[in-house]
């Protein structure tokens, strides 16, 4: 049975939180960049040091699980959103899309079939030019340190901004 590295505890639909969490998936310091950066550094590493030859692909594989976890969290936050007639979940005319357009990323509903997308919180597409693979192991590891540190900072900020237990 396939399981995520962390169990997601469903709370309540929250398309606003899903939109914000897109930054952690497809933003400049997001998991997609981190995954691809380790992938390219791993593939392009030509050094003879086997410990680094083993480390980089290992971290790349771990980052795949992070992308999957963030995608599943976004999807959980989008589940059942825009479908209820509860106050605050529809517009004045009762149309489910009203709430999605007003508070969420409309692309989650229109393009993404109410699921995660390879974009940041503003809806900008993920950008491969953010990936750094210099061919210099020390420079690559320093870039990774900044990337990982900034990613943790952003995740912490988003976690502290929401009371939704899905995070």
Label every PLM stretch briefly:
Residues 1-167:
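Non-heme di-metal
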């Amino acid at each position: 049975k396939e399981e995520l590295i962390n169990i997601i505890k469903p709370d309540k639909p929250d398309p606003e939180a899903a939109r914000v969490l897109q930054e952690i998936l497809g933003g400049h310091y997001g998991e997609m960049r981190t995954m691809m950066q380790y992938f390219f550094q791993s593939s392009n590493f030509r050094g003879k040091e086997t410990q680094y030859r083993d480390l980089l692909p290992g971290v790349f594989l771990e980052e795949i699980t992070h992308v999957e976890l963030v995608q599943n969290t976004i999807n959980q936050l989008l589940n059942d959103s825009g479908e209820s007639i509860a106050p605050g979940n529809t517009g004045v005319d009762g149309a489910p899309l009203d709430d999605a357009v007003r508070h969420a990323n409309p692309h989650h509903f229109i393009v993404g079939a109410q699921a995660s997308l390879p974009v940041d919180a503003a809806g900008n597409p993920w950008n491969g030019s953010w990936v750094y693979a210099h061919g210099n192991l020390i420079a690559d590891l320093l870039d990774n340190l900044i990337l990982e540190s900034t990613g943790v900072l952003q995740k912490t900020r988003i976690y502290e901004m929401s009371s939704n237990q899905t995070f």
